[in-house]
């Protein structure tokens, strides 16, 4: 992806320069690629003193926002067998992950502020639809984050059975959520370092397992489609692939905290894409090729059992520990993205300005509290229910993003794009067709219960925005647009 970078386009002759319409003051987010932080800081901590995220931490933050490793992909084998699981993790990135990552690189470098995709949609379709984008993306992110305490405990319960149900499980979810929320509160730079350390620890056991499995591999096992009498469970298969290979755009809500985003963001997305795809393909090849297939065993936590068979008890325990730490990393990355998105929306006047307040560690503490509360409320749902509901809401937001991408290409063809996908308007339309078709397929396989719940959530957003406008009009809560941000409206 880095090879696709293009020089900035000179848009001085075009009337609506997207970066700014009013004469730009010195503060940061006006010009694409400026590396200083948000000017709204306390006197004791000036903008230049704020540490920004560099390439390596950003790679692992993206890795955890999208993946976190092969934990949770087991259902793809259970649903469809080894062959379709392997093919899915090879082909699916070309249909979905690469287009989404490219769009994120282009749009994220155009608008290096924490509103991310909310800002993109607002410029293309207006503030009402910008708010809807923010609502469904935040809600799907919180739903997604509710999975990680569940997965964390699922991997530990084989070694600590008491965590399997009842009060101990509920208490463990609460303690874990509070502890990780506090780490988010302490600062994004700390979260970035933690993501790197956790990522290395989570990936290493699968590297070891892959090498140890070589003498036991039987390639013929990879060609099995499904041994189940009912055939392929397409709904579970597609939702598992989609959940494990989406959310590339989540990093856009952190671009205001990134050092030199015009260069750092595309590079980080490229490296993270490779890391994610390889972290799926090799464990699936290892697990299905080295051990006789029993599809019903391929559920959450099965990689630990595979590790015990291939390398011994020590490797199984290492994978269990890696799964636990991986879920911690995913929680941290997702909550960072969700909370900074709320901050970005507040800076744009879409939410009460209290959401724009930062702690002394420069973190959006109100957004963190809201996101953590949502995680606790939703954590009682089952894994598959959460995945299906989150996927459907995310699909709605992605449709808005694809429309926005094409519309901005048409509306502002000469605008400054520090990273530009080398296609024209027609190419941008064609690039969005395969993932849009995939969205339709996923929706078609969604059961009625999940569809109704997701539709209700969308309707809440449609009503919530006018209600907030009325609250602003009545003066019950204060809304304001940060002065350092560019004017998006013509």
Curated annotation (Swiss-Prot):
Transmembrane helix found in the keyword field: yes
Residue pairs linked by disulfide bridges in the UniProt entry: none
GO biological process, one term: polyamine transport
Keywords: Cell membrane, Membrane, Symport, Transmembrane, Transmembrane helix, Transport
Membrane topology: Multi-pass membrane protein
Residue spans crossing the bilayer: 53-73, 83-103, 116-136, 160-180, 188-208, 231-248, 273-293, 303-323, 363-383, 386-406, 425-445, 448-468
Family: Belongs to the amino acid-polyamine-organocation (APC) superfamily. Polyamine:cation symporter (PHS) (TC 2.A.3.12) family.
Miscellaneous comment: Methyl viologen is the brand name of paraquat. Plants over-expressing RMV1 show hypersensitivity to paraquat.
Stated name of the protein: Polyamine transporter RMV1
Biological classification of the source: Eukaryota, Viridiplantae, Streptophyta, Embryophyta, Tracheophyta
């Amino acid at each position: 992806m880095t090879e696709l970078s293009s020089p900035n386009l000179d848009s001085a002759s075009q009337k609506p320069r997207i970066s700014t319409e009013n004469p730009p003051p010195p503060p940061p987010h006006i010009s694409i690629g400026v590396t200083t932080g948000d000017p709204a800081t306390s006197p004791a901590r000036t903008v230049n003193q704020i540490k920004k995220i560099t390439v390596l931490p950003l790679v692992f933050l993206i890795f955890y926002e999208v993946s976190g490793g092969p934990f949770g992909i087991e259902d793809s084998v259970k649903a469809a067998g080894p062959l379709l699981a392997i093919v899915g993790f090879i082909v699916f990135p070309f249909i979905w992950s690469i287009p989404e990552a490219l769009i994120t690189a282009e749009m994220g470098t155009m608008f290096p502020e924490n509103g991310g995709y909310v800002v993109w949609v607002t410029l293309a379709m207006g503030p009402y639809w910008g708010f809807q984008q923010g609502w469904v993306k935040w809600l799907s992110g919180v739903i997604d984050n509710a999975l990680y305490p569940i997965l964390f405990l699922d991997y530990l319960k084989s070694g600590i059975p008491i965590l399997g149900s009842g009060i101990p499980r509920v208490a463990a979810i609460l303690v874990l959520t509070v502890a990780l929320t506090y780490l988010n509160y302490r600062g994004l730079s700390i979260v970035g370092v933690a993501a790197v350390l956790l990522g290395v620890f989570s990936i290493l056991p699968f590297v070891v397992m892959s090498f140890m499995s070589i003498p036991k591999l039987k390639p013929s096992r990879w060609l099995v489609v499904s041994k189940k009498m009912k055939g392929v469970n397409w709904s579970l298969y597609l939702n598992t692939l989609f959940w494990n290979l989406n959310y590339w755009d989540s990093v856009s809500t952190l671009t205001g905290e990134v050092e030199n985003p015009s260069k750092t963001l595309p590079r980080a997305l490229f490296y993270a894409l490779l890391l994610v795809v390889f972290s799926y393909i090799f464990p699936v090849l290892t697990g299905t090729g080295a051990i006789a297939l029993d599809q019903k065993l391929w559920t959450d936590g099965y990689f630990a059992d595979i590790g015990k068979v291939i390398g011994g008890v020590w490797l199984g325990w290492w994978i269990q520990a890696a799964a636990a730490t991986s879920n911690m990393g995913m929680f941290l990355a997702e909550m960072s993205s969700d909370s900074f998105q709320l901050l970005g929306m507040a800076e744009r006047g879409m939410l009460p300005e209290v959401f724009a307040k930062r702690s002394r560690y420069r973190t959006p503490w109100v957004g963190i509290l809201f996101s953590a509360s949502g995680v606790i409320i939703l954590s009682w749902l089952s894994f598959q229910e959460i995945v299906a509901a989150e996927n459907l809401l995310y699909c709605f937001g992605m449709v808005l993003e694809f429309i926005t991408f094409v519309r901005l290409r048409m509306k502002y063809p000469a605008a400054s794009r520090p990273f530009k996908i080398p296609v024209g308007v027609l190419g941008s339309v064609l690039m969005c067709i395969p993932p849009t078709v995939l969205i339709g397929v996923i929706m078609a396989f969604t059961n009625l219960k999940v569809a109704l719940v997701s539709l209700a959530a969308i309707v809440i957003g449609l009503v919530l925005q006018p209600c907030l406008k009325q609250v602003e009009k009545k003066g019950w809560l204060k809304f304001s647009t940060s002065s350092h941000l560019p004017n998006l409206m013509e």
